[in-house]
């Protein structure tokens, strides 16, 4: 039903976590809950309609629909995704800040909501050609490489991510700004623009993902209380309040 593929290009591997392909069959139904994540998803759909409502996405078969591109924003509330019918989805999962390397527009300007259609002429034209052959992943890789660009402003933000992601070393936001060579106000503005959330919100998402990873990878499963304190949350109610 879903096939996941790692990028073959060393350049793309730095900025893209994976690609995945979903093939829905006629009369099929599939749903899952997406929890807050530091990665960013961008999906190409064929023969599908996308409906957004109350932190949920319904993707339904629509043979009259052309190619549609959907981009997720940063969200701190779990999302329900529901798929119905025969449709095709090809997705790019970008690593933190990775999406910005392939667009001249910043992430926040493109994705201010939890999910929205991508309106970009170059990407729209590529989307129309994407489903015309079976060589879709190679097509996407070639296209992404053609769109890749460097940005010094973004480099400063990328340098801050490791410091924010380290749940064992609680460096203050002003200290992180100083370490990447920016004053606090400029750092917060650039971070919001390229990451779609504040540094504080990003750190919360990272701690939440760390808690999930800790739970899944531990040989001795920890209870919620242990996870709460291991990841720096004061109590269970605080953890639940943040993300549920």
Locate each region found by the language model.
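Alpha-helical bundle regulatory/interaction domains
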Residues: 1-174, 179-184, 197-198, 213-217, ...
